């Protein structure tokens, strides 16, 4: 079940490889995320000392939590196998590649994040993808009208 989606990532980047990572969270953060109070629009991923962290992810403090609720935009560790981290690190060293958060979802009761290795699109690529979507939309509309 997808809780938060980063639609802008598909528009701004060419997605190459996807990975599912766990997120190191506090108890009240889990409850808040399950309530849908999370945003990954400004989030980005960094590799620091062979560990992957998500920064800029906003988790609204749980309303029934105590005064010890964690910060809304604190740095959270992503949980991946060491082989996956090494593979991602090698790919990101290449110029033009970055790690992008795609969505936050539940998997077997655990909060997971789908991240991807991506390459940035140029403005002409973005225009091309918009034109392609418009063309597909027009084709669907024509087929729908022809079937009536």
UniProtKB/Swiss-Prot annotation:
GO cellular component terms, A-Z: cytosol
GO MF annotation: an example: RNA binding
Compartment(s) where it occurs, according to its Swiss-Prot or TrEMBL record: Cytoplasm
InterPro entries per UniProt: SmpB, SsrA-bd_prot, SsrA-bd_prot_CS
Any one Pfam family match given in the protein's UniProt record, by short name: SmpB
Primary residence: cytoplasm
UniProt cross-references to CDD domains, sorted A to Z: SmpB (cd09294)
PANTHER family in the cross-refs: SSRA-BINDING PROTEIN, TMRNA-BINDING COMPONENT OF TRANS-TRANSLATION TAGGING COMPLEX
Organism name: Fusobacterium nucleatum subsp. nucleatum (strain ATCC 25586 / DSM 15643 / BCRC 10681 / CIP 101130 / JCM 8532 / KCTC 2640 / LMG 13131 / VPI 4355)
Family: Belongs to the SmpB family.
SUPFAM superfamilies, per the entry: Small protein B (SmpB)
Role played: Required for rescue of stalled ribosomes mediated by trans-translation. Binds to transfer-messenger RNA (tmRNA), required for stable association of tmRNA with ribosomes. tmRNA and SmpB together mimic tRNA shape, replacing the anticodon stem-loop with SmpB. tmRNA is encoded by the ssrA gene; the 2 termini fold to resemble tRNA(Ala) and it encodes a 'tag peptide', a short internal open reading frame. During trans-translation Ala-aminoacylated tmRNA acts like a tRNA, entering the A-site of stalled ribosomes, displacing the stalled mRNA.
Ranges for region Disordered: 128-148
Protein name: SsrA-binding protein
Gene: smpB
